[in-house]
Curated annotation (Swiss-Prot):
Annotated SUPFAM superfamilies: Class II aaRS and biotin synthetases (SSF55681), Nucleic acid-binding proteins (SSF50249)
Entry's EC annotation: 6.1.1.6
Protein name from the UniProt record: Lysine--tRNA ligase
GO molecular function, one term: lysine-tRNA ligase activity
Cofactor names: Mg(2+)
GO BP terms in the entry: lysyl-tRNA aminoacylation
Keyword Kinase among record annotations: no
Encoding gene per record: lysS
NCBIfam families: lysS_bact (TIGR00499), PRK00484.1 (NF001756)
Binding residues for Mg(2+) 1: 403, 410
Cofactor note: Binds 3 Mg(2+) ions per subunit.
Catalytic activity, reaction form: tRNA(Lys) + L-lysine + ATP = L-lysyl-tRNA(Lys) + AMP + diphosphate
Length: 492
């Protein structure tokens, strides 16, 4: 061990050395012939009484393995992935085993236990030990309280300890896995094809965000970790695919807080020949399918509750702003009027945001977003903030776009995809103007994508769902750290 050891760690290291000297090196064990895990053992034998177990004759002893999380006199509590099991050493019948237990065993050790099922006087199913072998020695002292680690920083940095000693944490990650599996199952059952697109992009695109930059030595140029897979996926729709999805990592070189991590998981899906209304229906169907699949109907966060079975609400962004502020931005025709309203309501407007559309969005973010607790589709975003969305041709100030909000946070984003290459080029040019005015998140001109559009993108609906946010909302978790196995943390 590289660092200076404390007294307890020195004792543990001494025990390991004595095990090795006595030809009982735990690290020489390469496999274990377990007959049961803790769950299957309980399912099979917990139904029997103490007397029935005492009389029961087994064809062979039971073997189960797990980590020691509690030692109390002649009892040991072990834990595997499924649950916990008590082990019992009869020191009168097994003096050598009791000596081994006293000489070598510590909290945190991984052991292989063999014996016969029994029940204690308190009717707890236990394993009456015939043999016990340490198969991995814990040289570090585990947290003092086996029932949990309270320090959030330790839990994030040392997730392996958190998973061992916090049952709720492990359950959240099991839910995460089930949520992604259910999501994939929904798509596959409904005729979608799972695809993969590059993580390294030659140009920034697909979302408004700052990228991570890396050097591609073989090509002698900078590349970007993708901020979204949108543009490559739409190229596949041009290439005759009609129902596709991708679940994967995206990267945004921005701040960290309770709902943002620079590396995150999203799902994006694209369907040919449909519009944003179809994609809203699809979004709602996916989320309800997942909630049902994992057995969650309601979620409570900070005394606010969502019933996932209820229909999701829909409202235009301008209508919502009018409800909350009394301002009808559909009647605002001049930028000076919009700027005066922003000044009056103390809404800060940056140089690149001096358009009516940007100001509508700023009002929405300031006065509306946090109040959207129940799942709500906010629709018809201004064209200025939607460079990849098809226009609402009945009022081209707005687009056929929606965002889904719940618990005051964005959960999904979708729209009728802009498939007019001439309009798309003009939108990219507007983005370049914004970049010159200080918008670091503005898109670049993507000639390769424009060429794809010029070959003909059919009417298409697109959708992106933040998987991490979805896991948080379905499990009632307030910090994104708690649903990422290894969240990014600042150096100690």
């Amino acid at each position: 061990m590289s660092k200076k050891l404390n007294d307890q760690e020195l004792v543990r290291l001494d025990k390991l050395n004595r095990l090795i000297e006595s030809k009982q090196n735990p690290y020489e064990v390469t496999k274990v012939a377990n007959t049961h895990n803790t769950k299957s053992l309980k399912e099979k034998y917990d139904q029997f009484s103490k007397e029935q177990l005492a009389e029961m004759q087994l064809d062979k002893p039971i073997t189960v393995s797990g980590r020691v999380i509690l030692i109390r006199r002649t009892f040991i509590l072990i834990q595997d992935f499924h649950s916990e099991l008590q082990l019992y050493i009869n020191k009168n019948k097994q003096p050598d085993l009791f000596k081994y237990f006293n000489d070598y065993l510590d909290l945190g050790d991984v052991v292989c236990a063999t014996g016969k099922p029994m029940k204690t006087n308190t009717n707890e199913l236990s394993l009456d030990l015939e043999s016990l072998k340490i198969i991995s020695k814990s040289l570090r002292v585990p947290p003092e309280k086996f029932h949990g680690i309270a320090d959030e920083e330790i839990r994030s940095r040392k997730r392996y300890l958190d998973l061992v000693y916090n049952k709720e944490s492990k359950e959240r990650f099991v839910y995460r896995s089930k949520i992604i599996a259910a999501m994939r199952q929904y798509f596959n059952e409904n005729g979608f094809l799972e695809v993969e697109t590059p993580f390294l992009h030659a140009q920034i695109g697909g979302a408004a965000a700052k990228p991570f930059v890396t050097r591609y030595n073989a090509l002698d140029r900078d590349y970007y970790l993708r901020i979204a897979p949108e543009l490559p996926l739409k190229k596949l729709i041009v290439g005759s695919f009609e129902k596709i999805y991708e679940i994967g990592k995206c990267f945004r070189n921005e701040g960290m807080d309770s709902t943002h991590n620079p590396e995150f998981t999203s799902v994006e899906t694209y369907v040919a020949y449909v519009d944003y209304i179809y994609m809203m229906e699809l979004t709602e169907a996916i989320i309800k399918y997942i909630a049902k699949a994992i057995g969650i109907s309601h979620t409570n966060i900070k005394n606010e509750t969502i019933d996932w079975n209820k229909p999701f609400k829909r409202i235009k962004m301008t209508e919502l702003v009018k409800q909350e502020t009394g301002i009808d931005f559909t009647q605002v025709k001049k930028i000076d009027q919009a700027l005066d309203l922003a000044k009056k309501h103390k809404v800060h407007v940056k140089e690149h945001e001096k358009t009516i559309g940007h100001i509508i969005n700023l009002f929405f973010e300031e006065f509306c977003e946090k109040k959207l607790v129940e799942p709500t589709f906010v629709t018809h975003h201004p064209v200025e903030i939607s460079p990849l969305s098809k226009l609402d041709y009945s009022d081209p100030r707005y687009t056929e776009r929606f965002e889904l909000f719940a618990f005051g946070k964005e959960l999904a984003n979708g729209f009728s995809e802009l498939n007019d290459p001439i309009d798309q080029r003009q939108r990219f040019e507007k983005q370049l103007e914004e970049k010159q005015k200080g918008n670091d998140e503005a898109s670049e001109m993507d000639e390769d994508f424009l060429e794809a559009l010029e070959n003909g993108l059919p009417p298409t609906g697109g959708l992106g769902i933040g998987v991490d946010r979805l896991v948080m909302m379905l499990t009632g978790t307030t910090s994104i750290r708690d649903i990422l196995f290894f969240p990014h943390v600042r150096e100690e």
